[in-house]
Amino acid sequence: KICYNQPSSQHPTTKACPGEKNCYRKQWSDHRGTIIERGCGCPTVKPGVKLHCCTTEKCNN
């Protein structure tokens, strides 16, 4: 699986995730504004954090 892993609105970068079925995108807001985190897997998130998990290549931008 290839997933995007760049933070927020930075230039897209990808990461190979051997054996992983999912990619994810987490989004939340704080004093800096909207923060986006991308990576491999499908993590558990705290209340108030938007989570999008998906199963195709590079699906989490």
Swiss-Prot record:
Q: What is this protein called?
A: Short neurotoxin 1
Described purpose of this protein according to its UniProt entry? Binds to muscle nicotinic acetylcholine receptor (nAChR) and inhibit acetylcholine from binding to the receptor, thereby impairing neuromuscular transmission.
Alphabetically ordered keywords of this record: Acetylcholine receptor inhibiting toxin, Disulfide bond, Ion channel impairing toxin, Neurotoxin, Postsynaptic neurotoxin, Secreted, Toxin
Q: What tissues harbor this protein?
A: Expressed by the venom gland.
Under CDD domains, the record lists: TFP_snake_toxin
Keyword match ATP-binding: no
| Pfam families with a match to the protein in the record | Toxin_cobra-type
**Family listed:** Belongs to the three-finger toxin family. Short-chain subfamily. Type I alpha-neurotoxin sub-subfamily.
Q: Which cysteines are joined by disulfide bonds?
A: 3-23, 17-40, 42-53, 54-59
Which species is listed as the source?
A: Naja annulata annulata (Banded water cobra)
- PROSITE patterns recorded: SNAKE_TOXIN (PS00272)
State its location(s).
Secreted
**Gene Ontology cellular component annotations, sorted alphabetically:** extracellular region
* Domain of life the protein comes from: Eukaryota
Q: What's the chief localization of this chain? A: secreted
User: InterPro entries in the record, alphabetically?
Assistant: Snake_3FTx (IPR003571), Snake_toxin-like_sf (IPR045860), Snake_toxin_con_site (IPR018354), Toxin_cobra-type (IPR054131)
UniProt GO MF annotations:
acetylcholine receptor inhibitor activity; ion channel regulator activity; toxin activity
